[in-house]
């Protein structure tokens, strides 16, 4: 039996919400992102609240987060008083760049810890250095992927 496209759309939006929540974002922000990815068009602020069946306050918080991460952008439509939002250009590169920033913060913490380990603790230092190398490698790989996505 084939499923209704609206059913599939709803499940997709919910899945993106759950994935975003697992990454530390509000579930509503993920649901909004899923809606923008699926629909591919600008949506009025009030329509977001109606379509996702959440409060305008939740939409306001989520739009700020998604705008700060440069995943969506606010646009104006002639003759319309409310704000519209749409998927930003190259949002997936922006996602990767956000992850890279997080990895860089971890690297700083690891480096600070390394600086405090006495030189006579070579085994500990070696394990911590390997852990730092893991984060440097991930950061470099994600940076390259972001650059590749930007280049098209």
Predicted regions: what they are:
Residues 70:
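Glycine-centered, phosphate/nucleic-acid-interacting loop/turn motifs that mediate DNA/RNA or nucleotide
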Residues 116-152:
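C-terminal regulatory/oligomerization modules of transcriptional regulators
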Residues 1-23:
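N-terminal leader segment of winged-helix/HTH proteins
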């Amino acid at each position: 039996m084939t499923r209704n496209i609206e059913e599939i759309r709803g499940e997709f939006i919910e899945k993106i919400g759950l994935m975003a929540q697992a990454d530390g974002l509000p579930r509503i922000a993920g649901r909004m992102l899923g809606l923008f990815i699926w629909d591919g068009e600008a949506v009025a602020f009030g329509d977001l609240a109606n379509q996702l069946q959440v409060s305008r306050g939740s939409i306001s918080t989520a739009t700020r987060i998604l705008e700060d991460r440069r995943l969506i952008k606010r646009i104006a439509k002639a003759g319309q008083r409310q704000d519209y939002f749409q998927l930003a250009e190259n949002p997936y590169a922006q996602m990767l760049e956000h992850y890279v920033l997080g990895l860089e913060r971890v690297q700083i913490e690891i480096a600070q810890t390394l600086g405090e380990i006495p030189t006579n603790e070579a085994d500990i230092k070696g394990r911590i250095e390997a852990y730092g190398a893991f984060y440097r490698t991930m950061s470099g790989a994600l940076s390259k992927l972001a650059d590749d996505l930007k280049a098209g």
